[in-house]
A protein has these predicted regions:
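Histidine-anchored nucleotide/phosphate-binding helix
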Residues: 60, 135-147
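Ser/Thr-glycine-rich phosphate-binding loops at phosphate-binding pockets of nucleotides
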Residues: 129-134
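Active-site catalytic microenvironments for nucleophilic, acid-base chemistry
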Residues: 43, 142-146, 255-259
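Short, low-complexity N-terminal leaders and the immediately following helix N-cap/first helix
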Residues: 1-19
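Short, conserved loop/helix-junction motifs that constitute active-site signature segments
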Residues: 117-119, 145-148, 182-183, 232-235
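Reductase modules of NAD(P)H-dependent flavoproteins
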Residues: 3, 155, 160-281
Length: 281
């Protein structure tokens, strides 16, 4: 039997008409335990369905060390049919009550051990398409909070510059890396805009195209990602985490499969793999 807990919406930041950051605080004041990369299922009674609770899972953008609230970034997809729950969420306001079920999910858990039991010290590359960035915002804040020394790169793809939902937070984390030194905190954040020709994106001077174009080799044989880190990506030195629509997952694997990278679903006989992913469509 599903047990719904109750929480109150304490913060709403409307980034644009169809993109919002929302914070929830459980009514008992106790933020549930969870791991970076997990999702939480929330719900609201739908008045058009006899107040039946309509639920949906969302990746958590806040990090486990934050015991004040759960933060989500939510897209309102209105075509071809508006989402039943997201439509209600975009009409919700601070003070409204919402149901939730404890966080779960292991698809994007941070890999800490190699198959032989040794510590996984590979470079971490996180690729998020749209709101698929959320688990990696949690990753970045968590790894920063615990003082992880691994090299971490977060790549975000969006259609428009105002959809770079955590640009300021992630840029600040990169500045902290520059200030403290890479031996203490080694972090980079880069974004790509897929519609640079649109008037609204006229000021954008960064990477263009879908987020997986960071992996496409250029004339010299290095990809934009490899140029950023100053190193060649190999199976031994890098693990990828990917979240977004299935097209994003497929796009990443189109570049990585020819290089011998395999996913956790197709791991080798010895248990090794280089790509973990979660698709939400």
């Amino acid at each position: 039997m599903v047990v719904d807990n109750k929480a109150t919406i304490t913060y709403v930041q409307l980034l644009k008409e169809d993109l919002v950051i929302m914070r929830l605080v459980p009514n008992d004041g106790l933020v549930p335990e969870y791991q970076a990369g997990q999702f939480i299922t929330i719900g609201l009674p739908n008045p058009t369905e006899d107040n039946k609770i309509v639920r949906r899972a969302y990746s958590i953008a806040s990090h486990p060390e934050n015991r004040k609230y759960i933060e989500l970034v939510i897209r309102w997809v209105r075509k071809p049919i508006p989402g039943r729950l997201t439509t209600q969420l975009f009409n919700a306001k601070v003070g409204d009550e919402i149901s939730w079920i404890k966080p779960t999910g292991s698809a994007l858990s941070i890999n800490e051990k190699l198959p032989d039991g040794s510590k996984d010290e590979r470079r971490i590359v996180c690729i998020g398409g749209g709101t698929g960035l959320a688990p990696f915002v949690s990753f970045a804040q968590h790894l920063h909070a615990v003082g992880d020394k691994r090299e971490i790169i977060v790549l975000h793809g969006a259609s428009y510059v105002d959809e770079l939902s955590y640009k300021d937070l992630l840029t600040d984390l990169e500045y902290d890396s520059l200030d403290r030194g890479k031996d203490k905190w080694n972090f980079k954040y880069r974004a790509s805009i897929s519609r640079p020709q649109e008037w609204f994106n006229r000021s954008w001077g960064g990477q263009t195209g879908r987020v997986e174009t960071f992996l496409r080799p250029k004339g010299g044989g290095f990809s934009p990602l490899e140029e950023q880190i100053g190193d060649k990506i190999t199976k031994d030195n890098t693990i990828f985490y990917v979240c977004g629509w299935q097209g994003t997952i497929d796009g990443v694997m189109d570049f990585m499969k020819p290089r011998g990278f395999v996913t956790q679903h197709d791991k080798r006989a010895d248990g090794s793999f280089e790509v973990k992913y979660e698709s939400y469509g």
